Amino acid sequence: MADQGLEGSQPVDLTKHPSGIVPTLQNIVSTVNLDCKLDLKAIALQARNAEYNPKRFAAVIMRIREPKTTALIFASGKMVCTGAKSEQQSKLAARKYARIIQKLGFPAKFKDFKIQNIVGSCDVKFPIRLEGLAYAHGAFSSYEPELFPGLIYRMKQPKIVLLIFVSGKIVITGAKVRDETYTAFENIYPVLTEFRKNQQ
């Protein structure tokens, strides 16, 4: 299994991914400043893929199909883009939203584009003893199975949060660059193997 790369197409670079596992990016959250004041009501009325309910949330929610994303557009000109599966897609989507706003007659720019959060996931393909892990790594772990089935591991370096499930599925969140996602996973992998459940 170790040589199965992304979608099994190319081999994994073991210098970068010694575990042989490359976390898949699931969601990118980015922000950009359109640098102009926006009339949200006008945008919601003119754009067909937009909804605006100011009583519920003070932003226009807009969606596009390609890349499949959702944007939150605020009257201040600030915008949040979520749902993209890569940094490039997130930037492309944000540019498309900016263009839609321009076409509606606002002098929208594209300032300070920034990736705010990268969410990745992977599967180590073996079950994990979460109680043992939580006990041994108490300073970084919170595990309360009555409240949430996963162990929450707050890594200090890089500053990343991992959700570790008994099944061996891992969610990695908090990265601003994808290498932090990869580094965090490689840091935790030896710990996971140490607390591997012996299957009866």
UniProtKB/Swiss-Prot annotation:
GO biological-process terms attached to the record: DNA-templated transcription initiation
InterPro entries (UniProt xref): TBP, TBP_CS, TBP_dom_sf, TBP_eukaryotic
Main location per the UniProt record: nucleus
Gene3D superfamilies recorded: TATA-Binding Protein (3.30.310.10)
One Pfam family in the UniProt entry: TBP
GO molecular function: DNA binding; RNA polymerase II general transcription initiation factor activity
Subcellular location: Nucleus
Keyword vocabulary terms for this entry: DNA-binding, Nucleus, Repeat, Transcription
Domain of life per record: Eukaryota
Family note: Belongs to the TBP family.
Protein name per UniProt: TATA-box-binding protein
Source organism of this protein record: Solanum tuberosum (Potato)
